[in-house]
């Protein structure tokens, strides 16, 4: 029990640090919409580009656009449901709420997207820039999928392992993709990652919570 309480305190400390980091980053972006840090980071990322890399980066981001994203979520939930994993199917559907979270903050901060000649625009996007909805969604959806592959031992290992590897690939490649494509600044994707981790923690706690014993 003491070990369990210690683990909980550590996790709360980590989530608190993530929340503070996100709030500080939000304040920084609100007062400094275009910073030298963002410009220099974009220049470094976009310095080495070619047609093949353009295609790869577009492909990585593609699954986060409409209608691919909701189709992927609903399709994944249906697969879980078909194999009698009803609770998992429900929680997978909850990941679509990331769009509501990111859109609400975008409207509040109202940060413009990167534009030429400051950066090279490969993919033109709509909505505001902060935070990155793609990064938030990928961290939440693919992160939760990774958690399920770890927790649900009844799923065959030959499925759990590749799904986990692919999910982690998307999680860590999407921030690079969004900056490379000129769709976001460095601070946008960083905020999206932090917020995604916070949302993933909340969703995971709710999923792993054991029902109270009936009296």
Show where each model-derived region lies.
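Hydrophobic alpha-helical transmembrane segments
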Residues: 63-83, 139-145, 149
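N-terminal transmembrane-helix/juxtamembrane module of multi-pass inner/ER membrane proteins
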Residues: 1-68, 111-125
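Membrane-embedded catalytic cores of phosphoryl/pyrophosphoryl-handling enzymes
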Residues: 118-215
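Interfacial segments of alpha-helical transmembrane regions
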Residues: 73-101
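Transmembrane alpha-helix/helix-exit interface in multi-pass inner-membrane proteins
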Residues: 99-113
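Alpha-helical transmembrane segments of integral membrane proteins
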Residues: 11-15, 86-94, 159-166, 191
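Aromatic-anchored segments of alpha-helical transmembrane domains
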Residues: 21-24, 97-103, 168-178
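Helix-loop junctions at the membrane-solvent interface of multi-pass transporters
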Residues: 82, 108-109, 207-210
